[in-house]
């Protein structure tokens, strides 16, 4: 980790946020994750209301919520990119959190829509058990900064709870 980095806020609990949090924990940094949408269990009900009631929650829907936009997709894991890191490591982590062992050997790995939300829940639970924080229904509304020696740096974020509209700030050494 960078010298002096102790508090890192991650905006969003999609794949980048979840895997970023796990990586920070490996480096001894406990992340604070803020997510605009709901946890997957509540989000599943909110998404169902799109079809049953015709109502769309602007803060928790197919795009926003724990697990990101793909949490309620078909669960296919496919990339042709080889320059973005170790895809095998990602598959191993998915396996660790509950995916079928076949994703480690299949040419086109597939987790399945029914399993992916449970895997995302397991990832959150592990991050919390290791000291990380999760704040659902919490939208980043601004960045905090200060200027020191003519250089501007981020010092945290301002957030708003999407249900209560309560605002607060979260200080951090870094924001992802």
Give the positions of each predicted feature:
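Extreme N-terminal leader/targeting segments of oxidoreductases
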Residues: 1-6
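Short hydrophobic core segments
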Residues: 8-11, 34, 140, 157, ...
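N-terminal Rossmann-fold NAD(P) dinucleotide-binding loop
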Residues: 17
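Aromatic pocket-lining residues of Rossmann-like dinucleotide-binding sites
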Residues: 23-24
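Short beta-strand "acidic-cap" motif of Rossmann-like dinucleotide-binding folds
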Residues: 29-36, 40
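Conserved N-terminal/central alpha/beta ligand/cofactor-binding core
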Residues: 42, 48-134, 138-139
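Rossmann-like NAD(P)H-binding beta-loop-alpha module
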Residues: 78, 154-155
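A conserved short coil-to-beta-strand element within the FAD-binding core of flavoproteins
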Residues: 136-153
């Amino acid at each position: 980790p960078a010298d002096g980095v102790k508090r890192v806020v991650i905006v969003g609990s999609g794949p980048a946020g979840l895997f970023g949090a796990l990586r920070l924990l490996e480096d001894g940094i406990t992340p604070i994750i803020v997510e605009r949408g709901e946890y997957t269990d509540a989000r599943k009900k909110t998404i169902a209301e799109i079809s049953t009631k015709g109502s769309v929650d602007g803060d928790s829907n197919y795009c926003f919520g724990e697990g990101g936009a793909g949490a309620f997709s078909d669960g296919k894991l496919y990339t042709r990119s080889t320059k973005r890191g170790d895809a095998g490591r990602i598959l191993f982590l998915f396996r660790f959190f509950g995916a079928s062992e076949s994703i480690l050997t299949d040419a086109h790995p597939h987790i399945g829509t029914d399993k992916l939300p449970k895997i995302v829940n397991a990832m959150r639970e592990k991050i919390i058990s290791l000291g990380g924080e999760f704040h659902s229904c919490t939208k980043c509304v601004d960045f905090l900064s200060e200027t020191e020696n003519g250089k501007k740096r981020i010092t945290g974020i301002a957030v708003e709870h999407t249900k209560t509209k309560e605002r607060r700030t979260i200080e951090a050494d870094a924001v992802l």
